[in-house]
Amino acid sequence: LTYFLRGEAQIGPKVRLWFVVSVILHSLYLVLLGVHLDHLPVGNLFQVLTSFAWLLVVVYLYLELRLKEMTMGVFLLPIVLLFHIVSTLLLNLDQPLATVLSDMLFEVHVAFIISAYAAFTISFITSTMYLLLSHEMHSKELGIFFQRLPSLEFFESISNQSINIGFVLIAIGFILGLEMGLELWEGQWYTEPKLLSVIAALVIYLIHIVTRRSMGWRGKRAAIISIIGFTWLFTSMTIVNLFFTRFHKFQ
């Protein structure tokens, strides 16, 4: 935040160093958590949250180093911090693991899904930054977003690429999960809220890809669809995980 507000180049290396250290510490935390649990930390919602937060910062660190652009961090890191805090406060280390969750196929399924969510989160953040910058550029007064942020094309490119990658990942994760779920649900897949939520997300992001490529929907319209897709994913998955899901809890 200090780097974003002040724009002082000399702060950049220090900020990146602390960020790298935090990623290393988070990695060690996940390793120790996995050793304690005797499985990948994806067995319940709060394990997934901290794994997702880690994956998100790793992807962001890669983008930051590759693109040499640090401004996205001020929008992304609060999300990461929120997920990790919630996970740390509510994680139950003594909760038994359902038998089906120990299947390697399940872990691969979750890995694809949270990787897709990470891609969609990056798209959401860059789309939001695109709209903020676009709004400021069309206003009479140019402020901090115009001064600190790179071009609109920069954010549009990252957002579109993230959705392309995320769509493939979530489709693969969906197929793997469906293969497992059909055996558990005994043909009643249409009663599983989380599955229906993912199908709706697939439709939203498919609309983004199709309209962008065949109808030329770029810029603001593409950014808005990206934000709608992420908002749907975040709200629906939060509600479903906390209140409605039965089969994904395997109770």
Question: Locations of the language-model features?
Answer:
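Juxtamembrane inter-helical linkers in multi-pass membrane proteins
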Residues: 137-153
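Hydrophobic cores of alpha-helical transmembrane segments in multi-pass integral membrane proteins
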Residues: 1-96, 111-135, 152-184, 190-251
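Interhelical loops and loop-helix junctions of multi-pass membrane transporters/channels
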Residues: 95-106
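Short, flexible active-site loop motifs that bind/organize anionic cofactors or intermediates
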Residues: 38, 101, 145, 186
